[in-house]
């Protein structure tokens, strides 16, 4: 035991010796050529660990006081702490007698014991200053390092004169750098996020507005720039204690709020402790690397919480951030022994609880409540799937004589150009599934989107998005078929499991309107970093021998980690040969896929077969990939088979997409909700009798069952009209300002691998199981009261609806926590929005009238002046001519 104490307890004087110490037999000497980077964030834990030498590299450490050394249990473990405290005097005498094993000197124990506390404190201050300089250097290198960027984009900032200026904003951990240009050459200012709060701000202008402010109305600006600039570029004056910022779109604004919420918590780049879950990220492996990755910066935000998280402010004390009083200069300047002892007691407590680092767990990952079993919907693998053949064979159908009579009966009810949405179609042309189900055909290759989310090059991201878009068309039924028109309130749920990333892509759809027929859908895979939402208005036009099914609306694909939105449209379906010829179904129209943030876009043209064209002209497609107006590549081929891409720069042509049998084999497997757990208005259960009759080829029974469903829908509509009730959707809501349908429980936060555990779905609500519950930063597009699904969300899950807290004094309007919107549309908000629009229109009208009156009043005077001038010039010319004639006469 005495030997263990001698080998394991470095005396305070031993730490004053040379850096090349002579260690005991149980210690391995570190390579002196390897630079050992020691950060202030790791000083406290290394002081505890190095008091007990283990077979690891030995670093020169700052000296410890006797109180911290005595509180350490050395090699004996936590169970001997009390005994070690009783024998503290004995261990100190033995360690001092053998201190020459550590400092390599020939001084005896009496000489080493004469070291005064003043000398020890001097060494501590020296080490403190060195670590402080190193931390400051690392912070400055992070600010100037172009690779360490959380987010960067153009934002509009309101000045003190209430005018907006477009500036380039670069978000880094703990700071927001503002430049005049994108080249980061003209620095405007640096916002210190450590003392800032962020809140959404209502605004009449377009885009998304939020406010960054100091709660105590103090300055949020740094004194100097990232390169030591004392004066920033000349712009309009900006407020000192707050910034009002406006993004171009709501999705960009929400992404900025999420990123700022993370960045303002990252007041220290360096962490004092390292949790077990973070060891695989090489935080302690490469000690000679000072490069800080974006992933490490973001994960530092969630590593610690509560009282055990003490910020390392050594690198930002000079700029006067929040006063943490943790190893501050003021406390170091005082030579009060009681103050030193209090510091050492804190260190001792941390050492006592963290003796064995491998067994330590961070408090952030300790759930105070018992882990509850995950309550999620049961999904079953889809047993049967129909894939039609490529080409024209699977898109044509010969109508029997019996069905022709039904078609002629139908044609008597319609006229050319008529909308067929209210016409009851015969069941023999129905595909035995709902239109909500058919919209899910685009996600059997959702793994392409997972790859696109990881792609760094925006051009390659666009190519993968286009490839995914084309992958949704080759799955088609055999023959000419049309899916069921969904019943109002009908829903459909399914998911796909990604084997490579061990994630799930969830698909939720609901029929939100019957007249006009609108289907809303939402797709989410937060772990892989993408979500997609949209709504489709189905229209159909009759042209005599043909009809077209037009899908109006757009889908919005969002990459969560990048804040990019790809807006895309849909082609229309064209059926010809109704009266004569072979009935054929084709796709036609122009599709646009546009990313406003990057400037990249794609144009795809689905071509109809010409009247005299061969089978090679069936299902043709052509397209362009563009950056602005510049065409980067062209596409040619068939949307259900090979598509070739031709690069304009290299003029090389290669296969871009081809649904070969191998591709179809590796497509993701769809899982649908277990039939017993489905709601009565879910597609499979709602249409089960009609589907059963169609599969049995009993058209009479199918027509009867279809009529029962449609009549029940009409009766429900009449009842609501009698009671003056409005239909309230279950999962989606309408934005009265934009007219878009949004999923009520959307969660567009980037995936946090340290806090987010698994994404799951229950009762149509897509949620995330988390290790540590934190309030969500993102705010829903419309506030509403918690629905039945929200009340079922248990603590420990990521709730799609955030808690809205009161704002303190900096805003004139405070948001009450209980302010939630009822189901459906709040008439009060709609009325206020309409009044705001009316006021804006009146103001515009007044401005137009004033401008017109000004023009009318100024035009005659101008014309009169011009006429007088012309007359005067003519008179002078005539007079000059007369004088000349008189002289030469």
Swiss-Prot record:
N-acetylmethionine PTM positions: 1
SMART domains for the chain: PH
CDD domains for the chain: PH_OPR5_ORP8
Keywords for this protein: Acetylation, Endoplasmic reticulum, Lipid transport, Lipid-binding, Membrane, Nucleus, Phosphoprotein, Transmembrane, Transmembrane helix, Transport
One CC-aspect GO term: endoplasmic reticulum membrane
Cellular compartments annotated: Endoplasmic reticulum membrane; Nucleus membrane
Disruption phenotype: Mice are apparently healthy and show no developmental defects nor gross abnormality of glucose or lipid metabolism. However, they display a significant elevation of plasma HDL cholesterol and phospholipid levels. They also show a modest increase of APOA1, plus a number of mild gender- or diet-specific lipid metabolism phenotypes. Deletion in bone marrow-derived cells, including macrophages, reduces atherosclerotic lesion progression.
Membrane-traversing stretches: 871-888
Residue stretches of biased makeup (Basic and acidic residues): 73-88, 95-109, 116-129, 321-336, 346-363
Coiled coil: none
Ranges where the record places region Disordered: 1-129, 321-374, 772-823
Binding site for a 1,2-diacyl-sn-glycero-3-phospho-L-serine: 420-425, 485, 540
Keyword set includes Transferase: no
Entry's Gene Ontology BP terms: fat cell differentiation; negative regulation of cell migration; phospholipid transport; positive regulation of D-glucose import; positive regulation of insulin receptor signaling pathway; positive regulation of phosphatidylinositol 3-kinase/protein kinase B signal transduction; protein localization to nuclear pore; triglyceride homeostasis
Domain of life: Eukaryota
Protein's name according to its UniProt entry: Oxysterol-binding protein-related protein 8
Natural source organism: Mus musculus
Gene name of this polypeptide: Osbpl8
């Amino acid at each position: 035991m005495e030997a263990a104490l001698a080998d394991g307890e470095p005396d305070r004087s031993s730490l004053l010796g040379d850096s090349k110490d002579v260690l005991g037999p149980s210690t391995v000497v570190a390579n002196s050529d390897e630079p050992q980077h020691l950060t202030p964030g790791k000083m406290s834990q290394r002081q505890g660990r190095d008091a007990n030498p283990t077979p690891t590299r030995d670093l020169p450490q700052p000296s410890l006081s006797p109180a911290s050394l005595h509180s350490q249990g050395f090699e004996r473990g936590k169970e001997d702490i009390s005994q070690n405290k009783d024998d503290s005097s004995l261990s100190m005498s033995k360690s001092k007698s053998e201190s020459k094993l550590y400092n390599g000197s020939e001084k005896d124990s009496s000489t080493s014991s004469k070291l005064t506390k003043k000398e020890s404190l001097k060494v501590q201050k020296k080490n403190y200053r060195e670590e402080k300089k190193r931390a400051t250097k690392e912070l400055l290198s992070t600010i100037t390092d172009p690779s360490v960027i959380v987010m960067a984009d153009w934002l509009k900032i309101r000045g003190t004169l209430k005018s907006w200026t477009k500036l380039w904003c670069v978000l880094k951990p703990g700071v927001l750098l503002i430049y005049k240009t994108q080249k980061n050459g003209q620095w405007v200012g640096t916002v210190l996020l450590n003392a800032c709060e962020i809140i959404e701000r209502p605004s009449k202008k377009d885009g998304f507005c939020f406010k960054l402010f100091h709660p105590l109305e103090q300055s949020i600006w740094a004194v100097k720039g990232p390169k030591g600039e004392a004066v920033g570029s000349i712009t309009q004056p900006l407020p000192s204690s707050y910034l009002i910022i406006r993004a171009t779109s709501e999705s960009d604004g929400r992404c900025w709020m999420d990123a700022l919420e993370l960045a303002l918590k990252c007041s220290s780049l360096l962490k004092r402790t390292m949790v077990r879950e973070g060891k695989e990220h090489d935080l302690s492996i490469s000690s000679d690397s000072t490069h800080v990755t974006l992933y490490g910066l973001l994960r530092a935000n969630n590593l610690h919480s509560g009282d055990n998280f003490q910020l390392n402010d050594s690198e930002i004390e000079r700029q006067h951030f929040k006063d943490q009083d943790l190893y501050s200069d003021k406390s170091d300047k005082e030579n009060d022994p009681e103050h030193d002892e209090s510091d050492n007691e804190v260190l001792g407590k941390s050492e006592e609880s963290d003796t064995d680092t491998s067994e330590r767990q961070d408090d952030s990952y300790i759930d105070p409540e018992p882990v509850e079993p995950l309550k999620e919907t049961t999904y079953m693998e889809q047993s049967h799937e129909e894939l039609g053949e490529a080409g024209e064979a699977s898109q044509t159908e010969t109508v029997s004589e019996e069905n022709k009579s039904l078609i002629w009966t139908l044609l008597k009810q319609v006229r050319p150009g008529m909308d067929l949405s209210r016409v009851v179609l015969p069941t023999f042309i129905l595909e035995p599934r709902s239109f909500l189900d058919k919209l899910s055909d685009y996600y059997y290759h959702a793994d392409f989107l997972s790859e696109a989310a990881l792609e760094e090059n925006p051009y390659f991201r666009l190519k993968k998005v286009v490839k995914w878009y084309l992958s949704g068309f080759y799955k088609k039924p055999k023959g000419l078929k049309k899916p069921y028109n969904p019943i109002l309130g009908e829903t459909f749920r399914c998911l796909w499991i990604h084997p490579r990333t061990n994630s799930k892509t969830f698909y939720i759809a609901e029929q939100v309107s019957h007249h006009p027929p609108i289907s809303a859908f939402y797709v989410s895979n937060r772990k892989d970093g993408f979500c997609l939402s949209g709504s489709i208005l189905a229209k159909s036009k009759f042209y005599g021998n043909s009809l077209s099914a037009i899908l109006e609306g757009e889908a919005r694909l969002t990459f969560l980690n990048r804040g990019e939105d790809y807006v895309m449209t849909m082609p229309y379906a064209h059926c010809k040969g109704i009266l004569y010829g072979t009935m054929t179904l084709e796709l036609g129209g122009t599709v646009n896929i546009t990313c406003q943030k990057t400037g990249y876009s794609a144009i795809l043209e689905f071509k109809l077969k010409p009247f005299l064209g061969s089978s090679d002209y069936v299902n043709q497609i052509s397209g362009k990939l563009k950056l602005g107006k510049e065409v980067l590549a062209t596409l040619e081929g068939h949307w259900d088979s090979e598509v070739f891409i031709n690069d304009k720069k290299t003029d090389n042509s290669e296969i871009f997409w081809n649904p070969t049998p191998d591709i179809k084999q590796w497509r993701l497997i769809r899982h649908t909700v277990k039939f017993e757990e489905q709601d009565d208005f879910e597609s499979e259960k709602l249409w089960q009798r009609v589907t059963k009759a169609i599969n049995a080829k009993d058209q009479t029974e199918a027509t009867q069952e279809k009529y029962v469903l449609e009549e029940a829908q009409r009766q429900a509509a009449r009842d609501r009209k009698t009671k003056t009730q409005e239909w309230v959707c279950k999962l989606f809501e309408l934005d009265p300002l934009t007219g878009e349908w949004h999923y009520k429980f959307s969660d567009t936060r980037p995936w946090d691998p340290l806090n987010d555990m698994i994404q799951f779905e229950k009762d149509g609500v897509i949620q995330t199981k988390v290790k540590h519950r934190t309030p969500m930063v993102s705010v829903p597009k419309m506030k509403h009261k918690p629905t039945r699904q929200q009340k079922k969300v248990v603590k420990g899950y990521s709730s799609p609806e955030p808690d809205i807290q009161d704002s303190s004094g900096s805003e004139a309007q405070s948001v009450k926590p209980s302010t939630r919107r009822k189901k459906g549309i709040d008439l009060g908000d709609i009325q206020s929005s309409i009044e705001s629009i009316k006021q804006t229109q009146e103001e515009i009208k007044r401005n137009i009238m004033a401008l017109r009156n000004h023009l009318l009043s100024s035009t005659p005077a101008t014309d009169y002046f011009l006429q007088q001038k012309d007359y005067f010039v003519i008179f002078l010319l005539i007079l000059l001519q007369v004088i000349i004639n008189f002289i030469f006469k």
